[in-house]
Amino acid sequence: MKRILLLLLLCSTTLLMAQQTDPIQEAMASYDYETALSLIAQKKPATPLLLQKGKALRSLGLNAEALSTYQEIIGKDSTNTRALIEAAECCRTLAKYKQASAYYEKVLDLTPENKYVRIQYINLLLAQQKFREALGES
């Protein structure tokens, strides 16, 4: 009987802990990016927080600021594929196609099997009318 009671107590504690959500995550999930940014600003910048900051900035249409955030991450870890992909997307939106290509190429060097990045890179090449290069990538 003690074992069953202990097991129930542990299960309920685990469930209660799982229900606690991070206010930043909650703001991001609610598309309240301004609140998320203000909460992120109060914390010590770490890669996961900077990724969230970049996402919030991009969602608000602040692509130049988002690019700076992703570049900060890349400066600390040049193999962070998520930051590289997001930086490429920001560059593409800002019509910095040469820089976007460089980011996509870096990701493809790190993860050649990444189909999403390959497709985005091919689309970028096609948009620039670099048909031979795009054909070589497909």
Residue ranges and their predicted role:
Residues 29, 59-60, 93-94, 127-128:
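Register position in tetratricopeptide repeats
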Residues 52, 86, 120-123:
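Canonical tetratricopeptide repeat
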